[in-house]
């Protein structure tokens, strides 16, 4: 049996562009891809914190150091420049691998620069006003 497990996320990234006329996908700065262990073409889920929209698409590598998080194609109807999003990837792994899997959590600033790396999916952004859910167990 394979389990689908949380593999990585880029937490609270700011959407820098959205264009209906681009080929559908999400363009992400190569520095963020490396930090989150994401590959071009990889399936990701995007959760829009600003409006609650959720979608899935695939990754296109963006210019390294640019801070780009660009929503392309039809998804631009749902996600807009300035929105805060969480970009999440999953992995299908064996039960033994699932029990040992340490996800990558990438916290970014308003310019989509990495400010902290971690493995706890419930950890709030360092230095923010966010709080850990009181019911969440520390990873």
Curated annotation (Swiss-Prot):
Binds 1 pyruvoyl group covalently per subunit. Its cofactor is pyruvate. The active site is at 25 (schiff-base intermediate with substrate), 58 (proton donor). Pathway: Cofactor biosynthesis; (R)-pantothenate biosynthesis; beta-alanine from L-aspartate: step 1/1. The modification Pyruvic acid (Ser) is found at residue 25. The keyword Cytoplasm applies. Pfam families: Asp_decarbox. The keyword Nucleotide-binding does not apply. Its EC number is 4.1.1.11. Substrate binds at residues 57, 73-75. Is synthesized initially as an inactive proenzyme, which is activated by self-cleavage at a specific serine bond to produce a beta-subunit with a hydroxyl group at its C-terminus and an alpha-subunit with a pyruvoyl group at its N-terminus. One of its GO terms (molecular function) is aspartate 1-decarboxylase activity. It is an enzyme of class 4 (lyase). Residues 130-139 have a biased composition (Polar residues). InterPro entries: Asp_de-COase-like_dom_sf, Asp_decarbox. It is found in: Cytoplasm. GO terms for biological process: alanine biosynthetic process; pantothenate biosynthetic process. Residues 117-139 are annotated as: Disordered. Catalyzes the pyruvoyl-dependent decarboxylation of aspartate to produce beta-alanine. Heterooctamer of four alpha and four beta subunits. Belongs to the PanD family. NCBIfam families: panD. This is Aspartate 1-decarboxylase. The gene is panD.
């Amino acid at each position: 049996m394979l389990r689908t497990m949380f593999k990585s996320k880029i937490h609270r990234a700011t959407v820098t562009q959205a264009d209906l006329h681009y080929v559908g996908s999400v363009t992400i700065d190569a520095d963020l891809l490396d930090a989150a262990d994401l590959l071009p073409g990889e399936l990701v889920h995007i959760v829009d914190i600003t409006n609650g929209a959720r979608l899935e698409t695939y990754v296109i590598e963006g210019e390294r150091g640019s801070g780009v998080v660009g929503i392309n194609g039809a998804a631009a109807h749902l996600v807009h420049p300035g929105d805060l999003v969480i970009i999440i990837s999953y992995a299908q792994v064996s039960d033994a691998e699932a029990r040992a899997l340490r996800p990558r959590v990438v916290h970014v600033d308003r310019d989509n620069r990495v400010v902290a790396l971690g493995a706890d999916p419930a950890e709030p952004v360092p230095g923010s006003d966010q709080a850990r859910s009181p019911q969440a167990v520390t990873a």
